[in-house]
Amino acid sequence: MEMDKMQVVWKNQKELRCGYTTGSCAAAAAKAAAAMLFSGEEVRQVSLMTPKGIELYLEVEEIQRENESVSCAIQKDSGDDPDVTNGIFVYAKITKKKEKGMTLDGGIGVGRFTRKVLEQEAGEAAINKVPRQMIREAVQSQIEKYEWDGGADVLIYIPEGVEIAKKTFNPRLGIEGGISVLGTSGIVEPMSEQALTQTIFLEMKILCEEGHRYCYLTPGNYGNDFLRQTLGYDQELAVKCSNYIGDAIDDGVRLKMDGLLLVGHIGKLVKIAAGVMNTHSRQADARMEVLAVHAAMAGADRETVCALMECFTTKEALEILEAKGLLEETMRTVMEKIEYHLTKRAGEKMKVGALMFSDELGVLGKTSLVDELRKKIG
């Protein structure tokens, strides 16, 4: 299938354009460079069949020839995905060698692993498994097509990757000096949740490989700041799970971790009391419904319940609860319900807890295993 036949997807009632991964760019650049090296002819457009079954037709840029090598670039198009790599040039340099076989390495702007991570050894270029295979197959196809009797050295480099890497999770994933060459399908789908959840899983897996069986989860910067400023924790064993609380718990179970402690602002965590495990506002809200119901259970009158339902922020709701003398009891039952849903999601194989706070009032409540989990994390 050609890219133009599958260039849009529907997300949240909007038509959004797909793009292609850094892995596809690297493989296409390698194929084009190999074709020019072994044929002696210039290639201005290259085709690439992606693992997803979509065929790309990409413009070849920045062609440079030397005696025994050719380099060129493909410009990445992320489609409508909010991606820091959109528009960068991914280069491949192919050099002939008389001996059969192929080497593949990363140059400037391609990160290197500082430790063993998944299938990658320390010191290796951060070119993931599927892109490695795509690149090798692309070059091999040209070796066979033009009947070259030797081998090839392949170098992938992304000059802009050095600066872009500073905006990514790579340093936390044990990758330094540049970005990763990524992609399992070859295609970037707009607003893909998969990339985020894979990063969360990888961070947790690295902790496990380092021997850690417990860690903190935080939905975002508020949780990280609270860990550091209020709890005095340096975040070494804290994984930012964004809105994907349920997925992060599933990851912990999958990795056979012993315990997770979720620390977050009431604006996110209160939703869990309603069983909401993806806390993005687009998925569900339920903040005021939860607070109103639990306030009613604590003895709130109809007027108070209605006032809570009219609130726009949890700060407003907390002010009402505090003024009515209902805050402590409301938070107690909210935390009980949060614990119920977290425990139900985690099952019996992993301990899980939650500590909820607000900027103005500090700690609002905690589940029964919080103190135990904090000691285990250290």
Walk through the language-model features, giving the residues of each:
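Short, amphipathic C-terminal "tail helix"
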Residues: 351-378
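Residues within well-formed alpha-helices
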Residues: 25-28, 32, 247, 251, ...
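Generic N-terminal targeting/processing segments that precede catalytic cores or assembly contacts
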Residues: 2-167, 171-173, 369
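A structural signal for small-residue-enriched, beta-sheet-centric alpha/beta enzyme cores
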Residues: 2-10, 17, 173-179, 184-333, ...
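Hydrophobic, Leu/Ile/Phe/Ala-enriched alpha-helical segments that form helix-helix packing faces
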Residues: 33, 131, 135-146, 203, ...
